[in-house]
Design a protein with these regions (language model features):
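Accessory, non-ATPase domains that flank or precede helicase/AAA+ motor cores in DNA-metabolism machines
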Residues: 1-356, 368-384, 667, 694, ...
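Beta-strand-connecting loop/turn residues
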Residues: 2, 42, 461-463, 687
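Short, intrinsically disordered low-complexity segments
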Residues: 43, 673-701
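Basic, glycine-rich polyanion-binding accessory segments appended to enzymes
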Residues: 61-62, 657, 662, 671
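Inter-lobe coupling/hinge segments of SF2-like helicase ATPases
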Residues: 196-202, 206, 218-654, 661, ...
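Conserved beta/loop motifs at nucleotide-recognition and modification sites
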Residues: 208, 427, 662-666, 670-672
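Short beta-strand elements
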Residues: 512, 668-680, 720-727
Length: 731
């Protein structure tokens, strides 16, 4: 008999230990196989963590141990899904992020390989059958047979489904002129791009590449101004590692950036690339994962979750736009791709390159301390100048355009001039929808999400009110539910309204919009960006998705419609985010041969994040913001952990939060500051009340032990959920 130790996924319970099952079958089963097992009154899928051979029968074992073993129902896999390195990584993440191991394993794997019941219905390997040439001898063939034989010979192979005559095919096979070859099908098609000769490097780029290759640092920060040629540095380094038998993992912070990077890399490495991100179909993810695991792919391009790609001989990990918060996952396990990259680099002997024009304060601080290597690209390629910038004070009556509530006189004039010159424009507003809330003019009622208790945003395109936090949707009402009034007012503005205003002011201009509403439909992002790249539209309107990474050669004007919107958010990172967004947006202008200009509209023109973002003066911003962080004891001067409790009862969630705080205080941990419990900005999640505690600390070891003990103790309680977020971006 074999006893299997199995980690089980359960929707309601945090099962953070293996369960023992008897396996009486004869199938091969090892660590890393999935099995179906009975658990309570359900049949669940789990991962085998160990196999114990025993000479005892099931009955003898139960009699000896006084423990009744349930039996494994079936072994699902024919091969191991997880290698030893992946198990070690999962164990590290489980401990580091205080998350059950099974949940980490779910995060690491594509849908069809997850330890979940739904994965059993997922697509498996797809195949295609080809007709290949065996002999070009035409002797004894009919005219039609010769025609098809020549076609196969010319193309070397054709798909069987394209061979229209079944009888001719069967005859050619019988005469040993052609043969059928069955091959695994790749469901993801990468559009072929003409192979290009690498661009000539600038002196700065040459020095950057040489500096990285000769550095002994495991992690290096590449800080380069917008348009300085960081992408070419990435490509050359990837080429170096590929030529030396290594593989490369290239991460982007948003899916919208993958088409552009795929195009860049496919011009150099077409047959070696695999793609991983959430917009792929389950079948495509499965195919790409298999190509990576088998060693066919040498380069993986993808978003955050691609960090788990099982590349062989990993040599280089690149995080482009490393400062972007989407590298951090919000749901458990709340991992940061950089932390996973560091673990993999250490275990697999790889190097890490972090690239950004506006690095996170934590990364730049480590670079200046010598913890990371530090490389700078201070100039744009071809010695191009940075865009001229003008800050527009929206409180100044002389700036106001009486014919437009959204655009100042200066920005509107500049837009007209750019359009007259057939130049392109980018307009940024980091808020989607038409209006952020709808209120009743008579009684003041504001339409709110029933589960989150925050204002619903109005989307004019589909006449809906939407919650941007939980995706609750309702038809836009015409009557106030409180007083019955029909006088409803749409307050504020989003990207939809910007698009409407542009169309009103410039009716002949062709506009495109790119935000998360547009990107929800697969392929929309690529279509919008390709159209704008091909100059099929004059103006691109969007959220932060359009602010970073894109290289539009004909864009000469950027307008940041409301630059200070993020400064009102309750976050210690609000100034940093605002600075980064302005800097990145301004950097989209003037990347070609024409000079660029940017207009930054704001109600806070003297704020240092706005002023220095307009100048792209990162060094000065870094000094000011680091002083602020030091005074308030926020990262990088301290570490953070947020504890988020949710419960159906408002009183109970507060009581448990106080209990946790008391347990932490009893440990008397040195240099630990406990803030809260407090009710966050979004005070409800899924109709459950929320409270938070924030921990500031400097020594990790003791806090890890205490939090793990608290987590396991509270796991015995029911009716609430606890999320532990290490190094949170927000709280």
């Amino acid at each position: 008999m074999r006893i299997l130790e199995v980690y089980i996924e359960h929707a309601a319970l945090d099962l953070d230990r293996p369960f023992s099952y008897a396996y009486l079958g004869d199938k091969k089963v090892e660590k890393g196989y999935r099995v179906s097992v009975p658990f309570r009154n359900q049949i669940l899928i789990g991962f085998v963590s160990s196999v114990i051979e025993t000479p005892l029968t099931k009955e003898e074992y139960e009699e000896k141990t006084a423990y009744i073993l349930k039996e494994v129902i079936d072994v699902i896999d024919e091969e191991c899904l997880l290698n030893d390195m992946q198990w070690k990584l999962a164990t590290f993440l489980s401990n580091y992020y205080f998350t059950p191991l099974i949940r980490v394993l779910q995060t690491m794997l594509p849908p069809s390989l997850k330890p979940k019941s739904s994965s059993l219905k997922a697509p498996k390997i797809a195949y295609e059958t080809y007709v290949e040439i065996v002999s070009s001898n035409e002797e004894g063939l009919t005219d039609q047979q010769i025609e098809w034989l020549r076609r196969v010979a010319k193309e070397e192979r054709i798909l069987k489904k394209d061979f229209r005559s079944k009888s001719i095919l069967e005859k050619l096979i019988a005469l040993e002129r052609v043969k059928l070859v069955k091959e695994e099908k790749r469901r993801l098609t990468i559009k072929s791009s003409p192979m290009e000769t690498p661009k000539a490097l600038t002196e700065d780029q040459q020095k950057a590449i040489q500096s990285f290759l000769t550095s002994s640092k495991e992690t290096t920060l590449l800080e380069g101004v917008t348009g300085s040629g960081k992408t070419e540095v990435y490509l050359r380094l990837a080429e170096h590692y590929i030529q030396n038998g290594k593989s490369v993992l290239f991460l982007v912070p948003e899916i919208s950036l993958t088409p552009m990077m795929i195009e860049y890399f496919s011009r150099r490495f077409i047959e070696k690339i695999a793609i991983l991100h959430s917009e792929l179909t389950p079948g495509q993810k499965y195919d790409e994962y298999r190509r990576i695991a088998s060693g066919q792919a040498k380069i993986v391009i993808g978003a955050r979750s691609a960090i788990f790609a099982p590349l062989k001989n990993l040599g280089l990990i690149i995080l482009d736009e490393e400062h972007v918060e989407t590298y951090k996952q919000e749901n458990a396990p709340c991992y940061h791709a950089l932390e996973v990259a560091k673990w993999r680099a250490k275990e697999e002997g790889a190097r890490i390159l972090l690239g950004s024009a506006t690095p996170s304060l934590e990364s730049r601080a480590r670079a200046l301390k010598g913890v990371y290597g530090y490389i700078q690209l201070a100039n744009r390629i071809h010695q191009g100048a940075l865009p001229e910038t003008e800050i527009i004070d929206l409180l100044n009556p002389n700036s106001v355009d009486k014919d437009s509530v959204l655009f100042s006189l200066s920005l509107r004039k500049a837009m007209k001039e750019a359009l007259d010159k057939k130049e392109q424009i980018v307009l940024l507003l980091n808020r989607r929808g038409y209006a952020p809330y709808v209120s009743c003019r008579k009684c003041g009622y504001v339409f709110k999400c029933p589960t989150c208790d925050i204002a619903l945003s109005y989307h004019k395109e589909d006449q809906m009110l939407k919650c941007h936090h939980c995706d609750f949707v309702m038809q836009a009402p015409k009557v106030c539910p409180e007083c019955g009034s029909t006088y409803l007012s749409k307050q504020g503005f989003g990207t939809e309204r910007i698009e409407e205003e542009v169309t009103r002011l410039f009716p002949h201009a062709k506009t495109l919009r790119l935000d998360s509403d547009v990107s929800k439909v697969r392929q929309n992002v690529e279509k919008v960006l390709k159209k704008f790249q091909n100059q099929e539209a004059d103006i691109l309107i969007g959220t932060q998705m359009i602010a970073k990474g894109h290289d539009f050669q004909n864009v000469t004007l950027v307008g940041v419609v409301l630059a200070d919107m993020g400064l009102t958010m309750p976050s210690f990172r609000s100034s940093e985010r605002t600075f980064q967004l302005i800097t990145q947006a301004v950097g989209r202008a003037g990347r070609g041969t024409k000079k660029g200009k940017a207009f930054i509209q704001t109600y806070m023109p003297t704020h240092y994040a706005v002023r220095l973002g307009a100048k792209q003066d990162y060094a000065h911003f870094f000094q000011i913001e680091m002083n602020s962080r030091r005074m308030q004891q926020y990262p990088p001067y301290t570490y953070l952990i947020s504890l988020t409790l949710t419960c159906i009862s408002e009183d109970k969630v507060h009581d448990i939060a106080l209990e946790i705080k008391e347990m932490l205080e009893e440990e008397n941990i040195e240099d630990l500051t406990i803030l809260g419990p407090t009710v966050p900005y979004i005070k409800k999640q899924g109709n459950m009340f929320v409270e938070q505690l924030l921990l500031k600390y400097k020594e990790a070891k003791k806090i890890e032990i205490v939090l793990d003990k608290i987590r396991r103790k509270l796991a015995l309680k029911s009716g609430y959920r606890l999320k532990i977020d290490r190094d949170p971006y927000d709280f």
